[in-house]
């Protein structure tokens, strides 16, 4: 099982300081739909792991989130890709749950659900907490510089997990993965 986990806000869609609260505010990052299509076509299972504390803060509802995710699914399919599952944490930091990144609960659940190997699983995110969550299970962290990624790199570059790879966009990450898949293997 080849699994890639994507953070949502700032990676797949544009992020907002005041939360993405509705389907109209959910706007894809340029190239992200094609990136998911490339990953799908390369044989990867693609899952989304997203903290959505706006639900816990009552900024939007689960129904609003469902509508945003329906739009994301539709646009990804139109590009020729597939998202095989979406996991979200509705809690705030004060709830002290195990699913809110950087805690690894959501990531462990995804890896278990797809019977994947943590050490072979990528997580692409734009925040330190995304990278810490995949690092906690022994996976492969990738930072993209969209969303909060540039700020994360400048303010937390010294704290990134040791094997973090940095890409400008999700599309750049997907092209790297496709090159890795087509590179000749050593005997």
Curated annotation (Swiss-Prot):
Its EC number is 3.1.3.82. GO terms for cellular component: cytoplasm. It comes from the Bacteria. GO terms for biological process: ADP-L-glycero-beta-D-manno-heptose biosynthetic process; lipopolysaccharide biosynthetic process. It catalyses: D-glycero-beta-D-manno-heptose 1,7-bisphosphate + H2O = D-glycero-beta-D-manno-heptose 1-phosphate + phosphate. Pathway: Nucleotide-sugar biosynthesis; ADP-L-glycero-beta-D-manno-heptose biosynthesis; ADP-L-glycero-beta-D-manno-heptose from D-glycero-beta-D-manno-heptose 7-phosphate: step 2/4; Bacterial outer membrane biogenesis; LOS core biosynthesis. GO terms for molecular function: D-glycero-beta-D-manno-heptose 1,7-bisphosphate 7-phosphatase activity; magnesium ion binding; zinc ion binding. Zn(2+) binds at residues 89, 91, 97, 99. It is found in: Cytoplasm. The keyword Plastid does not apply. Its cofactor is Mg(2+); Zn(2+). Keywords: Carbohydrate metabolism, Cytoplasm, Hydrolase, Magnesium, Metal-binding, Zinc. The record marks 100 as: Contributes to substrate recognition. The active site is at residues 7, 9. SUPFAM superfamilies: HAD-like (SSF56784). Mg(2+) binds at residues 7, 9, 126. Belongs to the GmhB family. Monomer. This is D-glycero-beta-D-manno-heptose-1,7-bisphosphate 7-phosphatase. It comes from Neisseria meningitidis serogroup B (strain ATCC BAA-335 / MC58).
């Amino acid at each position: 099982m080849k699994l890639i986990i994507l953070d949502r806000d700032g990676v797949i869609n544009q992020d907002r300081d005041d939360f993405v609260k509705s389907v109209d505010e959910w706007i894809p990052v340029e190239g992200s739909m094609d990136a998911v299509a490339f990953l799908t076509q390369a044989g990867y299972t693609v899952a989304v792991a997203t903290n959505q504390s706006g639900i816990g803060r009552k900024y939007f509802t689960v129904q609003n989130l469902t509508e945003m995710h329906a739009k994301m699914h539709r646009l990804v399919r139109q590009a020729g890709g597939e998202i095989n599952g979406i996991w979200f944490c509705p809690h705030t930091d004060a709830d002290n749950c195990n699913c809110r990144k950087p805690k690894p609960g959501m990531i462990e659940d995804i890896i278990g659900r797809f019977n994947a190997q943590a050490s072979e699983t990528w997580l692409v995110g734009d925040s330190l907490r995304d990278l810490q969550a995949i690092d906690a299970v022994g996976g492969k962290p990738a930072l993209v510089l969209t969303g909060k990624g540039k700020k994360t790199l400048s303010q937390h570059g010294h704290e990134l997990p040791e094997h973090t790879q940095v890409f400008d966009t999700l599309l750049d990450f997907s092209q790297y993965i496709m090159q890795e898949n087509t590179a000749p293997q050593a005997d």
